[in-house]
Amino acid sequence: MTGQPSTPVRPGSVVRTVRRHRGGRSATVQDMVAAEMPVAFNYNGVPFAVMMATPEDLEDFALGFSLSEGIVDHPQDLRVVAVDTFLEGASLQIEIPPERAAALDQRRRNLDGRSGCGVCGNESIEAVLRVPPVLQSALRIDVDALARALDALHARQPIAAQTGAVHAAGWADAQGMVQLVREDVGRHNALDKLIGALARARVDATQGFAVVTSRASYEMAMKAAQARIPLLAAISAPTALAISLADSAGLTLIGFARDHDCVVYSHPQRLDLGVAVGEPA
């Protein structure tokens, strides 16, 4: 049922009239669906990328994307001048130092239609497969902290609860207490928004860990490592390349994290499973 007007409920969701069939019955009802729109990134007045994203927490998105993509190295190197939203999309006006802007001229974009991107604008295999500086963190958590964070993440996803159509990324301290959560239709975007929120709040990312409601792709592992998050736990599986990157970058990568169960793919020293090595878990 296309072409009908939609009523905004919150930036991340809209109401649509749908025909629902359930249990042998059919009815016309109002349904909540996830909002998705193009978000344009403009650095120093020059268009750079267009991402398909959920139109919430866009300042966090601007900062997190810029940090995880290596456009800037420090939050103070960036200023969000304006966030312009309109019916068809949103435009982010971002200022960065001239030398950083010049470097962007060497990177090309082809992002239309993607819900997030983790290797954006790289023109060679070597650039894509770069390894961030090795993570140095004394973080150590136990499996109870991981389970606690997963439970809290599930409870702090209002858009997902309404629509069932978005990903979430959360950051928890070493005790598993979730401090920040961000949602988006794109898993990369959700993590970028979280990274931006951490930077804006001046949180030391090395003192906690991230949990995500998606698989752990190479791009997700790269973003976590770039943001100096020492442990990334995903509810689904990682890819082989993500594991290799995590191993090289000093990132603890966890997959299939659900309740007290998980699989640790790299740097297991940061997770205390409460069992001896070799003992069935």
Curated annotation (Swiss-Prot):
Keywords: Cytoplasm, Molybdenum cofactor biosynthesis
Protein name listed in UniProt: Sulfur carrier protein FdhD
Gene: fdhD
Pfam families named in the record: FdhD-NarQ
Function description: Required for formate dehydrogenase (FDH) activity. Acts as a sulfur carrier protein that transfers sulfur from IscS to the molybdenum cofactor prior to its insertion into FDH.
PANTHER family in the record: FORMATE DEHYDROGENASE (PTHR30592), SULFUR CARRIER PROTEIN FDHD (PTHR30592:SF1)
Compartments reported by the entry: Cytoplasm
Cellular component aspect of the GO annotation: cytoplasm
GO annotation, biological process: Mo-molybdopterin cofactor biosynthetic process
Tree of life domain: Bacteria
InterPro entries listed in its UniProt record: Cytidine_deaminase-like, FdhD
Active-site positions on this chain: 117
UniProt-recorded Gene Ontology molecular function terms: sulfur carrier activity; sulfurtransferase activity
Family, similarity comment: Belongs to the FdhD family.
